[in-house]
């Protein structure tokens, strides 16, 4: 893990509980997870289409919350895109919207800006879940989630 572990240690003393690829928000009793995909790091437009890119972004977050026992309900989407890829960006956003609706996830906000490469970051927030009902990787069994 290296630097990822070091970064997590810096923030792990905050009021929320960080672990297993998502955090637990004590005050609202919700799980939250975020993932980012970057063009030419996580995918290349020559090999992945708009539907595959949208699927990768959503599923990486969805599985983090679901495997912890939660149900993703809300999302915040941040998109950075090159001006010459406007149509492709809109197509990816349409695919994200379709898949989100299929999974009962409401995109409630986010941000857009221009950049040299396409970058998308999605944060998903779960329904309420009691702390005692969270499934931890260390104690998970087949059929838990």
Language model features by range: what are they?
Residues 5-7, 15-20, 57-60, 101-106, ...:
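Short amphipathic alpha-helical surface micro-motifs
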Residues 7, 59, 64-67, 114:
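Hydrophobic side chains within alpha-helical segments
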Residues 37, 71-145:
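Glycine-rich anion-binding loops of enzyme active sites
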Residues 48-52, 56, 87, 134:
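Residues at secondary-structure transition points
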Residues 53-65, 95-99:
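Short, well-ordered amphipathic alpha-helical segments that serve as non-catalytic structural scaffolds
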